Amino acid sequence: IRDRSPSRGLGDVYKRQSMASIPEIFGSMVFDDVSMKERLPKQTYKALKKTIELGEALDINVANIVANAMKDWAVEKGATHYTHWFQPMTGITAEKHDSFINPTDDGRAIMEFSGKELIKGEPDASSFPSGGLRATFEARGYTAWDPTSYAFVKDDTLCIPTAFCSYTGEALDKKTPLLRSMDRISTEALRILRLFGDEETTRVLTTVGAEQEYFLIDKKLYEKRKDLIYTGRTLFGARAPKGQELEDHYFGTIKPRVSEYMKDLDQELWKLGVFAKTKHNEVAPGQHELAPIFTTTNLATDHNQLTMEIMRKVARRHGMVCLLHEKPFAGVNGSGKHNNWSLSTNTGKNLLDPGKTPKDNAQFLLILMAVIKAVDEYQDLLRLSVASAGNDHRLGANEAPPAIISMFLGDELTEILDSIENNSEYANKGSVRMEMGTVVLPNIKKDTTDRNRTSPFAFTGNKFEFRMLGSALNIACPNIMLNTIVAEAFCEFADELENAEDIRTAVMNLIKREYKEHKRIIFNGNNYSDEWVEEARKRGLLNLRTMPEAMRYYIADKNIGLFMKNSIFTEPEVHSRYEIQLENYTKVLNIEALTMLDMAKKDILPGVSAYVKELTETANAKKALCADIPCDAEIDLVKKLSSLTVCFSKKIAALEQALLGTKEVEGVQELADYYKDHVFAAMQELRAVADEMEINTSSKYWPYPSYGQLLFGVYD
């Protein structure tokens, strides 16, 4: 009998807690505003709030008081260490743990934590990706406390969210440019609001809710697959007899083992202040989704990194493994991450809410037009912000949006903008109620537009849903790009409108002009269709199918100019990110190729050969017993597998040759192109032969768990 207890330690304590206790546990491991107010002197609390809300410098005396209160709180929660928790350009989080203990004169220890230790840390910067910003011998780097993101206790450690920079001041992380972009869009959005008489708002915040898809598989099966262990995805594997064809998994009943995992996951995330809201089965067998309530972008980024970490950790407690790779299994849907992005004022207004009469809401229409302009002019930046080796498997595969950037606005907003362009009257259809055909069901108010799940960038009522992100991606990069390009559009609009005599007329004229220039980016149809690919080409839209194609645009003059003008990146910071991401792409493919060779030579070839030997011995035994006993089935299968084995050996040699060729290639872009065109192509050919061999080989001899076992193994 398998032990399916969902948790150990603290997880058991609240596993069965009632829903009424959620407010008590929510944020219990976070040093949030409530904790600050309770534990800090009134003046210290006010000073810290000014730092958080207005960006004022934090006095060291205030920092010392905050640090001591934070330490006392953390120790009460069981913490013995602290860490500056940051997000280097690896895309995952990093942490170095230091204990609170300090020696006393009598040889004993006390627990101390100073303001200096809170504000600044010094991790080794040479061991993280820097893209040439730091040489190996230039090791000094700094972490700086981000007070806008709350500290929390995890695994008996006080985690302090921080930014990470080099000794010379260059950003070496994801958070620093994200915070810069948030400042930039706030500044420019305020200029837009002032045009419409809003003098009350002092800050505009971008908010994000990141829907996280993932797979769950049995841990014992996972441990038998080298490819999953080394790369996070299956490099070989014939399709299971059943996949997602019946469409019976999406929103289906959650199986007990998965349900227990989800309950435990919710509890862990709630303790850390993550607003985990929705959970359900996704399309593919073994695939699921968790969606949070939106929050400010830097906090949402921290929360999503925490969510992915906790997902993996909790899964292992349940005897499962959480796969966050974008395409762990061929033949079924991969996993993405929808980035729900909006703009809110510090007074609580959603600037992307069209209101009841959007045609009369000039402020909303101007902001909408700025987003349209931004997405059209900087398609390349949005595309490259989601580029990765893993995401290349998803985009354009009829399971995720294509690699072509377009926007879905829906019928109502498109018709309003068309009417402005054509100087025509917009015919408001008004609200419609749906007749359900039976008296027992209520008449439901129908939305003004349908949803388009194939669109990469869709307006969904009061936010934009950017759907191209891969499941493993750090959401900082796409949000840096979104914030920056929209800030640039706001800036251009404000420059033009601030001197206008009649603001409404000037706004409508601007919208008319800009819509005519940028409406090519709007497409409300089927983004999966071949017809759209051709139509997009005619419209002049980019179709950057792979990461190496997209990354070239990172260092385009117009994009470097944009980043520098808005103080998001310096030119060296742009080049460093370009190089780091291309290097990561080639390293990922190299690891995958080496793993395939290891599996092919050490496991698959010997396994198939052993099966061929058994078939041969069976045929010979039949003939020895009686010459009249037919052996056609064994002989035909031996011939087929022998032929496949010869082909497989040739494909192994071809992949080895392709890898040798990488040594002759110079330049990060050229090397990435080579891996895409030669190494990956050889990997695909090797896999095709192996999958055919698997179909024809006894499961007794096939060295790895099958797709059927992996995808359906958590339901037994």
Describe the role of every protein-language-model region.
Residues V62-V66, F86-P88, K116-E117, F164, ...:
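Active-site-proximal loop/turn and secondary-structure-junction residues that shape catalytic pockets
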Residues I1-Q17:
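Single conserved hydrophobic/aromatic residue that forms the stacking wall/gate
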Residues K15-V34, T187, R191-L193:
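Flexible inter-domain linker/hinge segments
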Residues I511, K516-D716:
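C-terminal amphipathic alpha-helical interaction region
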Residues A139-L324, N333-G336, L343-E579:
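Glycine-rich, acidic/polar active-site loops that bind/position phosphate-bearing ligands
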Residues I25-A139:
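Active-site core of metal-dependent hydrolases
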Residues G91-D106, S126, R225, G232-T234, ...:
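Short linear, low-complexity motifs centered on an aromatic residue
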Residues V62, F86, S114, P292-F294, ...:
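Active-site proximal loops enriched in glycine and acidic residues that flank catalytic Cys/His/Asp
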